[in-house]
Amino acid sequence: MSDYKDTLNLPETGFPMRGNLANREPEMLKRWYKEDLYGEIRKAKKGKKSFVLHDGPPYANGDIHIGHALNKILKDIIIKSKTLSGFDAPYIPGWDCHGLPIELMVEKKKGKPGQKISAAEFREECRKYAAGQVEGQKESFKRLGIMGEWDKPYRTMDFGTEANIIRSLGKIADKGHLLKGFKPVHWCTDCGSALAEAEVEYKDKVSPSIDVKFTAADEAALLEKFTLAEGHAGQGEISIVIWTTTPWTLPANRAVCLRDDLEYVLIQVEANGDQPAQRIVVASELAKDVMDRAGIEHFHNLGFATGADLELSQFNHPFYNFTVPAVLGDHVTTDSGTGVVHTAPGHGQEDFVVGKKYNLEIANPVGSNGVYLPDTELFAGQHVFKANDSVLEVLKEKGALLHHHAYEHSYPHCWRHKTPIIFRATPQWFISMDQAGLRAKALESTKSVEWMPEWGQSRIEGMIEGRPEWCISRQRTWGVPIALFVHKETSELHPDSPALIEKVAKLVEEKGIQAWWDVDAAELMGAEDADKYEKVLDTLDVWFDSGVTHFSVVDSREEYNFPNEERTHSADLYLEGSDQHRGWFQSSLISSIAMKDEAPYKQVLTHGFVVDGNGRKMSKSIGNVVAPKDVTNKLGADILRLWVASTDYTNEVAVSDEILKRSADAYRRIRNTARFFLANLNGFNPETDLVPAEEMVALDRWAVGRAQAAQEEIVKAYGEYNTHGVTQRLMQFCSIEMGSFYLDVIKDRQYTAKQGSHAQRSCQTALYYIVEALVRWMAPIMSFTADEIWNEMPGERDTFVFTGEWFEGLFGLADDEELSNEFWTEIQSVRGAVNKLLEDARKEKTIGGALQAEVTLYADDALAAKINKLEDELRFVLITSAAVVKPLSDKSDTAQATDVEGLYVEVAATEAEKCDRCWHHTPDVGTIEGHEKICGRCVSNIDGEGEVRKFA
């Protein structure tokens, strides 16, 4: 026989080397949906212990971006890993569908409600627009391989969800947490509406920084409050000086605020040219700063008083004809300014609190469009930000401006319009943080939640401690109505509000939110009451919509009804970006405590923001945006999924073409490992060909044991949501334990052993067990590729890998086995040392390849005893044609030291002939008649009983 190719067990598989994912994945998706993969998973897991990851809803506007992809892929990985861990883990994706961005898009096309289009028609157009946006985003998410209830997602605009949002409001009101108040709220003049805390972002803004004088209304009374040296009361007008960066709020000033324990100084300012002498009052600590910036060089102190001493002293408003009192507040600091705070209760939270304490007027001279109202003296009709200059002019005319300069500082802006906002007192509905102890309960509840990373707890606690009342009302058209009736004269809620809310909710369940605006009050409460009560026409903050989904979705959907369990929380896990401590995590927690006295989640996991390779934010202007669609079209979704899983997502997550290329390289290594397994299982039938564990070749049992060890670590990492740890362990297993050692060693046996022999079947048994485990490890991350592998694997199996659980057929070497794990670790060290010297010999042209080498290992007694356990099979482990072990004392002059203690190695070129079939060089090549070009081992593997392997 001259051609022995047909006698080899050559690898063969339909699993291609190239993934070609961009083209192949869409075909797999079609099959998943045609065969109802998600439904099959649900059937397989019915009755198992539940796990609920509740989806924070993205906003239904625009294409998905890379941050959306990161978030949804992480969720999908967790859901799939929980499923493989034996949990029933349904996933209902959601969308946030009400609110201003959608209104603005519809306004562009249809005009403002009440002008070119009725409010009812406008709402319907908003509903249509949001539905279209949901469909577009849904297809993008499905393309990423994310499994869920895509045919029945939750949308906050679904009639049933809208009804449950209204019911949530009713529950919160019933528990005593609802409050109506005239309070300053974040107000966007472009939106014409109040903003939630989470809708405010801070950016640098240049404002006028001014020091303003309020003259004393009664100088003699004021002087009595200072400790003055006798006869040294000074001369000139007396003023107290405030500092502000919002001159436009001065028309609403109703007090100057001091701190009770601060020391204030009365300063004599000398006359200077045409400037007469004057006396001013500021905090002692800041006096020098004030004098320096005002350019005042000649001054001295006259006397001192505490803030408490000066309480209720009267001062003249700088340009209106009334006086304002000095009041006390804890918010006054000496970080900057004058130690005296301009107080406009209608334009600031702290000012409002102080104003209530001192019964000050809550003046609000500014309209919803940011323009002073017609009766505003001096400034009527001016926009507040343009009025700053006018206010400065008036202050100069009145001699009240001590100093001004341009000042850059962090200032609140509308997250949508990116424009500066104002604080403006308006009648609004609030969830009170304190009137029924909500703040304290919310803070207490954070202790029962597992926050990942741990700093999430202190972050959200700080935010809850410092947050104002939650303003839940909006003056918008497209939103869930605040479905309440209030008395026309007293503004009190209707005494039968709970029953009325349920009636409205039932109407909304049937007809949507338009039912609220259409219904006649008399239909709900009778004509007599209808004359006394009126509808609230405000809509709910969209953060309320999404915040109550623990009730409106999780507690309400049939998919989350687990009849055999008593669940203590609505959800097991919330997973969103770290910005949601001030957004969805907080709105969910507050509403859940208000409604149910418990947190809505057991665990909260956060991920960082996506940045480019240089750590910069994604920006169209910079040109560094990575769009998910571009990645899936070019590389495939599994590459994107592997990138997500490989990152330490608790910090900022970097992405770029170069980073994705590295993910693609890692993917190829994993794919090639899987392909080796599949190709070498060619002709293997697990029903008939499995070798019992105790009869397997030692190295094969070691390999299965390495898979068992890897699986323990991988499953643990999945359970801890440590996807980074999963991918690292997966790569280590594929590249190091398998690729660099086991798969390299077994090639000779797998390819050349007698077909169907124990030597071959033992190896295939190991490969089979390992790939059964490997495909499951991959499935949550590289879902498409795992499905592809699954369909190429031998043996009867379920249609999909995703309906099963972690492979339980793995086993390892016993600790007391002669060829234990420790033994194989040492052998790998020996092999590594030999390989280094073989590589040197190759470079020096002593040999061509390793099979052209014969190696002699000179080892100390202990090491030699271990190596000799492999007997003649040592050469197969070293992949050399011959390998002998000799005592260290016999080492030749040409033997070289190695990194392994007690080991020297001599490499020599073999003089034996090369076997045409196995490529080993052995003395018996050509000695057997009829097989002149192959070795005796190969002859036995072709015509005889086949070689016997015990160790490798």
Swiss-Prot record:
UniProtKB keywords: Aminoacyl-tRNA synthetase, ATP-binding, Cytoplasm, Ligase, Metal-binding, Nucleotide-binding, Protein biosynthesis, Zinc
Top-level taxon in the UniProt lineage: Bacteria
GO molecular function list: aminoacyl-tRNA deacylase activity; ATP binding; isoleucine-tRNA ligase activity; tRNA binding; zinc ion binding
Motif window: 'HIGH' region: 58-68
Entry's Gene Ontology BP terms: isoleucyl-tRNA aminoacylation
Species per Swiss-Prot/TrEMBL record: Vibrio atlanticus (strain LGP32)
The protein's Enzyme Commission number: 6.1.1.5
Catalytic activity line of the entry: tRNA(Ile) + L-isoleucine + ATP = L-isoleucyl-tRNA(Ile) + AMP + diphosphate
InterPro entries: aa-tRNA-synth_I_CS (IPR001412), aa-tRNA-synth_Ia (IPR002300), Anticodon_Ile_BEm (IPR033708), Ile-tRNA-ligase (IPR002301), Ile-tRNA-ligase_type1 (IPR023585), Ile-tRNA_ligase (IPR050081), M/V/L/I-tRNA-synth_anticd-bd (IPR013155), Rossmann-like_a/b/a_fold (IPR014729)
Cofactor(s) it depends on: Zn(2+)
Record's cofactor remark: Binds 1 zinc ion per subunit.
A Pfam family recorded for this sequence: Anticodon_1
UniProt-recorded name of the protein: Isoleucine--tRNA ligase
Comment on protein domains: IleRS has two distinct active sites: one for aminoacylation and one for editing. The misactivated valine is translocated from the active site to the editing site, which sterically excludes the correctly activated isoleucine. The single editing site contains two valyl binding pockets, one specific for each substrate (Val-AMP or Val-tRNA(Ile)).
Entry's localization field: Cytoplasm
Sequence positions that bind ATP: 620
Any one of the GO CC terms: cytosol
The protein's role, per its UniProt record: Catalyzes the attachment of isoleucine to tRNA(Ile). As IleRS can inadvertently accommodate and process structurally similar amino acids such as valine, to avoid such errors it has two additional distinct tRNA(Ile)-dependent editing activities. One activity is designated as 'pretransfer' editing and involves the hydrolysis of activated Val-AMP. The other activity is designated 'posttransfer' editing and involves deacylation of mischarged Val-tRNA(Ile).
UniProt binding sites for L-isoleucyl-5'-AMP: 576
Taxonomic placement: Bacteria, Pseudomonadati, Pseudomonadota, Gammaproteobacteria, Vibrionales
Record's keyword annotation contains Cytoplasm: yes
Positions of Zn(2+) binding: 915, 918, 935, 938
Motif 'KMSKS' region: where in chain: 617-621
UniProt family annotation: Belongs to the class-I aminoacyl-tRNA synthetase family. IleS type 1 subfamily.
Subunit structure: Monomer.
